[in-house]
UniProtKB/Swiss-Prot annotation:
InterPro entries: PsdUridine_synth_cat_dom_sf (IPR020103), Pus10 (IPR005912), Pus10-like (IPR039894), Pus10-like_C (IPR048741), Pus10_THUMP_arc (IPR055174), THUMP_dom (IPR004114). Residues 77-98 have a biased composition (Basic and acidic residues). The lineage of its organism: Archaea, Methanobacteriati, Methanobacteriota, Methanomada group, Methanococci. This is tRNA pseudouridine synthase Pus10. The keyword Heme does not apply. Responsible for synthesis of pseudouridine from uracil-54 and uracil-55 in the psi GC loop of transfer RNAs. Residues 70-98 are annotated as: Disordered. GO terms for biological process: tRNA pseudouridine synthesis.
Length: 519
């Protein structure tokens, strides 16, 4: 505890801020805690002061009595005027005066500390224990030239406090709260959280308290300010503070009343089916103009007229009125690939929505009116759903139409028996697949291990067959078939010893806990 007032000597902290230094001790408000601690310190100083004053008075009495005795004492002619006795008395008197001087120095130090406590907001200290001159602010001649600084004499301890600068003043809190209510009026939300931005000098002060003075029980002003402002806003907004999942985080600088809104996104999850080829999963900028708009893209800035993302997001954004959106899916299919079965799991993230509560069934109906994409199982999700879809391994079932390169038919024996045998050879087969050439511009050049668990091959004619595989997600099926110039090993072309390619590909199922594989 700061019984020597070292902290107050460096920082003239008000009662609230002084209590915040010891915020982790005792369950009470910082202002009450600070007042209580200062009171105990003041009582300790006053007790020492009383003892010193009493000791000083006793010494004064001793000196006074000694002087009276010396004046009335008869000189003994037979003892050479008793010079030795007088010298001893003078020495003793001088010693007592030195002690009084030392006591006065101690008394002055204690009074300086008591004056400092009064100056920083502690009432109840006796006036005789205060050094009046120290109560006045030491304003230099240059400072006096400024009207603003001349008024410093009339500032409260809180306004003078270098830590809080009186930001906890109820008027300041109410003004900030009213600004926040106005800023939030255009947003729909159920829960909120207050965040506090501190100026650099305040952060440095807090760090100094922790390092220089080794105070480990300190609470940052940002925590207390957020707590106090949150109480006022809870009543004004009639909505609760939520530290875990707030819809909106209100960032406040309490020193200049600036407000910043962090509107957290909403997440809507479901599954989509792509029943038409030629639709990419996400928006593609025009290759010629890079999204700026040109004759080739009919000034749309898009390489393709639409995408799965745009079809799903448009009706959502029309209602939510967000600033942007992003589609997160469990993998992706190529533009020329269908996505059938129960559909691919996805999450649509709406950034900074003004409306959070929507009729998802109605939105689902709107999406399903558009040819080529269907959605199902729409419901509200959370941010963790995005991580799950991105990181959780999914197994998948594909169906491919495999064709043999025409010019190679004459040079290779293609028999139906080989196709039937291929099913057995592919089952439980490990595939080492280096990043395909066609995606090497956007994916790291690595060798990835994937597994085929089950395969079914069915001949169609003398140069094509149907291939169905149940395998790990992330296995490039087109390259599994072609071999990609040896980058995928083994490949179907290698096993059959005849060059093959994928003519058509369809994702039949994306398997997860809600859609397990039953093979």
């Amino acid at each position: 505890m700061d019984y020597e007032n070292k902290i107050l000597q460096k920082y003239n902290l008000c009662n609230r801020c002084y209590g915040r230094i010891y915020a982790k001790l005792m369950r009470m408000g910082n202002k009450d805690r600070g007042t209580s601690i200062k009171t105990v310190i003041a009582m300790n100083f006053e007790e020492k002061l009383k003892d010193l004053i009493e000791e000083k008075n006793n010494l004064i009495d001793i000196i006074s009595n000694s002087q009276d005795i010396n004046e009335n004492e008869e000189i003994d002619e037979n003892t050479k005027n008793n010079e030795d006795t007088e010298n001893k008395a003078d020495d003793k008197s001088q010693s007592n005066e030195e002690k009084i001087q030392e006591i006065d120095e101690k008394i002055n130090i204690i009074k300086e500390n008591l004056t400092l406590l009064r100056k920083t907001g502690l009432n109840g200290i006796k006036n005789e224990y205060i050094i009046e001159e120290l109560l006045k602010d030491d304003i230099t001649r240059e400072e006096n030239e400024s009207e603003e600084n001349e008024s410093n004499i009339f500032l409260t301890p809180e306004q003078k406090c270098p830590w809080c600068k009186d930001v906890f003043n109820i008027q300041n809190l109410e003004e900030i709260a009213d600004k926040i209510v106005e800023a939030l009026s255009e947003y729909e939300f159920d829960r909120f959280l207050i965040g506090t931005r501190l100026p650099k000098r305040i952060k440095e002060l807090e760090k100094d308290l922790e390092t220089t003075f080794n105070e480990k029980n300190t609470e940052s002003l940002r925590n207390e300010f957020g707590r106090e402002l949150g109480k006022i806003l809870t009543k004004k907004l009639e909505k609760p503070v939520d530290k875990e999942t707030p819809d909106i985080v209100v960032m406040v600088n309490p020193y200049n009343q600036k407000i910043y809104l962090q509107i957290n996104p909403i997440f809507i999850k479901g599954r989509y089916r792509k029943t038409k080829r030629g639709i990419p999963q996400s928006h593609w900028d025009c290759r010629s103009c890079r999204g700026k708009g040109c004759e080739k893209c009919n000034f749309t800035g898009k390489q393709y007229p639409t995408s799965v993302e745009e079809i799903i997001a448009e009706p959502v954004m029309n209602i939510a009125k967000g600033s942007g959106e992003a589609l997160h899916a469990a993998g992706r299919e190529d533009i020329d690939v269908k996505m059938l079965g129960k559909g691919r799991p996805f999450v649509i993230e709406v950034k900074e929505p003004k409306v959070r509560k929507m009729d998802l069934l109605k939105i689902m109906d709107e999406i399903n009116k558009i040819e080529g994409v269907e959605v199902s199982d729409l419901e509200y999700g959370v941010k963790n759903d995005v991580r799950f879809f991105k990181n959780e391994p999914h197994t998948k079932t594909y169906c491919a139409l495999v064709s043999i390169v025409d010019e190679e038919l004459e040079n290779h024996d293609f028999e139906n028996d080989k196709i039937v045998e291929l099913s057995e050879k592919l089952e439980n087969l490990r595939i080492d697949q280096r990043t395909p050439h066609r995606v090497s511009h956007r994916r790291a050049d690595l060798v990835r291990v994937r597994n085929i668990y089950k395969a079914w091959c069915e001949p169609i004619d003398e140069k094509s067959f149907k291939l169905t595989v149940y395998c790990d997600g992330g296995l490039y099926i087109k390259e599994l078939i072609s071999g990609d110039e040896g980058r995928t090993k083994p490949s179907i072309s290698e096993i059959l010893d005849i060059p093959c390619y994928c003519k058509l590909l369809t994702v039949m199922e994306v398997h997860d806990e809600n859609n397990p594989a039953n093979y």
